[in-house]
């Protein structure tokens, strides 16, 4: 089980990413396609944005336990929680494989 502070940190990062997404995208577009002087200025502004507003810094975590590894994107939980919930029949449409 992850510490509550780690879960809170990820939530805080997600909020920052959402808040600065449009501004970051606009600046990156200028850096890619603008004139060199404008591109340099946009790059400087991009560096002034908060470090945690970069989506690369976000990490997928299990919604139930906060576990960072073994994350299954389709369900948003870790492999351990997935197995436990599937065994108990808590995930609709999931059953053990047999062939």
UniProtKB/Swiss-Prot annotation:
Known partners and oligomeric status: Part of the 30S ribosomal subunit. Contacts proteins S3 and S10.
Keyword Ubl conjugation: no
Gene encoding the protein: rpsN
Function: Binds 16S rRNA, required for the assembly of 30S particles and may also be responsible for determining the conformation of the 16S rRNA at the A site.
GO cellular component, one term: small ribosomal subunit
Single GO MF descriptor: structural constituent of ribosome
Name the UniProt record assigns to this protein: Small ribosomal subunit protein uS14
Keyword Electron transport: no
Family: Belongs to the universal ribosomal protein uS14 family.
Pfam families on file: Ribosomal_S14
HAMAP family: Ribosomal_uS14_1 (MF_00537)
């Amino acid at each position: 089980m992850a510490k509550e502070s780690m879960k809170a940190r990820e939530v805080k990062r997600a909020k920052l990413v959402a808040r600065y997404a449009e501004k970051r995208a606009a600046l990156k577009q200028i850096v890619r396609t603008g004139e060199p002087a404008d591109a340099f200025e946009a790059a400087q502004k991009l560096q002034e944005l908060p470090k945690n507003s970069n989506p690369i810094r976000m990490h997928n975590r299990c919604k139930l336990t906060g576990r960072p590894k073994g994350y299954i994107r389709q369900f948003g939980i870790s492999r351990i929680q997935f197995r436990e919930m599937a065994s108990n029949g808590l995930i609709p449409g999931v059953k053990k494989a047999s062939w």
